């Protein structure tokens, strides 16, 4: 397994701050669904044990649609969605790579998550929210 580092992240106004343990070379997903396209969310899915909300829980509000499984959390002050609980991995946390401090990131490799083929795409990334996840 790749060695982990602690990345720090925040929303635009800084009221919501968090940490996530992830590799310095991040494998991210770009989803082509409507909400991800419109918000520019770049996905890093991790098990809950690797995510820590440091401050700002009181500034988070949720938006749900369609099946209601995904809990899109965004800062009610600046409107940025720094992380959420994804429909593809409802037992994980999905961090917006664009909200991470770039100082701890060496590279970001982006792969497509094809929402038009959601079932196959979801099956391919199911392991991401598991503890000790390694790419298969």
Predicted regions and their residues:
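A short Gly-Trp-Pro
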Residues: 1-136
